[in-house]
Every structure is written in structure tokens, then in C-alpha cells.
Amino acid sequence: MTAKENVELALQICKNPRDAETVLKEVGLGERLNNFPSQLSGGEQQRVSIARALAKNPKMLLCDEPTGALDYVTGKQILKLLQDTCRKQKMTVLVITHNSAIAPMADRVIRIKNGKAASVCTNPSPVSVEDIEW
């Protein structure tokens, strides 16, 4: 199935989904809507997965290494999209990452050590993704 069909399939079980094409454009795949997985790079496939998750319009979104297969610029674009979506849609977005440099964008940072929460810090002034470098 195409990238668009992949996202649309996931929306069949949702009460209040977002438009598949719109979300695919938001993740930078507006020109790849009708491409099949074999025609997409690993990073593009990851963005289809992110689009599928965002299009479901959940109250909580768990993102495990959302920038793992992405280049620096695309990774920042996706993090910015997640940050903006969190704010605009009042969605809780949990980002699990080994990249501690992106912690300043978070409202709250939970550091895990040996499978347990080692610390929990609230960030009163989250930084925009554009201002973060790694």
C-alpha cells in the first residue's frame, strides 16, 4: 500500500482523525503520497509511521527515538512538528531518546537509569526546537 493508504488504514479505527494527506505533508512527504514502502528511504518510512500516529489525533503520543533514522534537518523539523502539535492540540507527547541535547524543548524531563526514574525535572521555560543544536 502507498504511504497515503498506510495512514488512511490506521484512521479507520479512530473517532476524530486528522486528514491523512495533510499530516503526510506536515512530515515532509507531500510529494511521496503515492509511493510504496520499497520506494521510500528508512527515514521516509519512519516519517510515514509518525504521520500515521499523528493522524489518529491521540490525546497521548509516545515517540520512541522519533529522529533515529532521520538526518539532522529533518529530525529538527519532526521535533518542531511534535512540539507544535503538543501545544496546539493539547496533546501529551512523550519523547524517548538517547539524545539529551533535546531535553530543553521538554516541559518535563525524566531521566532513566538502570530501568528506574533517576530524576524528574520540570522545565518552566521550554526552548523552541529551532534554538537547539546537537
Where do the language-model regions lie?
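ABC family nucleotide-binding domain
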Residues: M1-M105, R111-I112
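Conserved beta-strand-loop-alpha-helix hinge in the C-terminal portion
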Residues: K116-W134
